[in-house]
Amino acid sequence: MSKNIGVLGCGWLGLPLAEYLLKSGHRVSGSSTSKSKISMLNSKKITPYLLKVSKDGIDGDLGFFDELDLIIIAIPPRLKSNPKKRFDLMIKQCKKVCIDHNIREVIFISSTSVYGNLSGVLTEESQLLPESISGKQLVSCENLLVNTPEFSTTILRMGGLIGADRHPIFQLSKKTFVDNPNGRVNLIHLTDCIQIINSLINRKIVNNVYNCVTPYHPSRNKYYNQIADQLGCKRAVFKGINTINRQVSSDKFIRDFAYQFKVKNLLILS
């Protein structure tokens, strides 16, 4: 069934997601903070809106929120570069506008950083012990949205995002050394991010939480060295033996949606 969908934040994930949903027959609106991106969205037949979300409100054309069946909040926190930023208050503003516009279904893109450095196999029922500023604020955002009776929210806790132009190895290879060599990777490819969201859209959105991590967990040392060789990058220099051995499980989503991951080996060529 065709839906009227708004993608709030047409960035690295939001833009290709909006393109895919449009090709799937949905009516798609997309927001950006960049004026230069508006014409690009328009050229792709995505209805464009210039919007800027801050802790104090949302500036721009609020017509973006009109008559939406579903909104996907895909705004990256970007708290590493701006640790004083109040992403949680930004999402609070989004919540208010969604209520004002009678939006009933929300998908919120969160992160596995909400688990902090917990060890073991982590499920959606695991304790949340975020250590980073981003992780702490994302927990607040999740609680804010799922406890709003005016709409239903599905939270997607994405692992580390990778794609053709994005991979942790590009940064790891620049570091003097990288710790936790025997820890497990918990990543997900852009293709699977989009397909998981599409699977959700084809059903009624309900209050729920899903981990979204490819069920492929080699050691960091083995995986990043192999991918570096494959991509022609400098290998990361691993140091230390202290291991945070965690494995984020996506079994719940796989079970509920009979989902099969598309990029099974995280770009590793067998």
Task: Say what each PLM segment does.
Residues 14-15:
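N-terminal Rossmann-fold NAD(P) dinucleotide-binding loop
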Residues 157-158, 167-170, 177-201:
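Substrate-positioning beta->alpha
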Residues 47, 51-55, 234-235, 241-270:
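C-terminal amphipathic/interface module of NAD(P)-dependent oxidoreductases
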Residues 196-250:
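Mid/C-terminal beta-alpha module of Rossmann-like enzyme folds, strongest
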Residues 66-107:
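NAD(P)-cofactor binding segment of oxidoreductase domains
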Residues 141-164:
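Conserved beta-loop-beta element that borders a ligand/cofactor-binding pocket
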Residues 5-9:
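Conserved N-terminal Rossmann-fold NAD(P)-binding element of oxidoreductases
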Residues 93-131:
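Conserved Rossmann-fold NAD(P)-dependent oxidoreductase catalytic core, especially the SDR/UDP-sugar
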